[in-house]
Amino acid sequence: MKYIILFLVLIGLQANLALGSKCKCDCTKYPYSPVCAKELKTGDTETFNNVCQLQCYNCTHMKNYVVIYSGSC
C-alpha cells in the first residue's frame, strides 16, 4: 500500500513538472504594466503585473483570464 501511494505521489509530481515546463513564465524582460483581467468561467477579476504574468498564471493554474482593461482592477 505504501508503494502505491508513493507511486501516485511521484506521478503527480512528474505531471506538475511537465505542465510547468510547457508554460512560458520568464516574465523578467517585460516591464511593469498592470492589467485588470476577468476569469471567463467564474467572473473573478485580478490584477496582473503584465500580460506575460497573466498568461503564465493561466497556463500554470488552468484558468482563462482575459484582459478587460489596462491598469489595476
Swiss-Prot record:
Disulfide bonds join 23-59, 27-52, 36-73. The keyword Disulfide bond applies. One of its GO terms (cellular component) is extracellular region. It holds the Pfam family Kazal_2. Keywords: Disulfide bond, Protease inhibitor, Secreted, Serine protease inhibitor, Signal. SUPFAM superfamilies: Kazal-type serine protease inhibitors. Expressed by the venom gland (anterior main gland) (at protein level). InterPro entries: Kazal_dom, Kazal_dom_sf. It is found in: Secreted. Residues 21-73 form the Kazal-like domain. The record marks 29-30 as: Reactive bond. GO terms for molecular function: serine-type endopeptidase inhibitor activity. It comes from the Eukaryota. Residues 1-20 form the signal peptide. May act as a serine protease inhibitor, since it possess the kazal serine protease inhibitor signature. This is Kazal peptide Pr13a. The lineage of its organism: Eukaryota, Metazoa, Ecdysozoa, Arthropoda, Hexapoda.
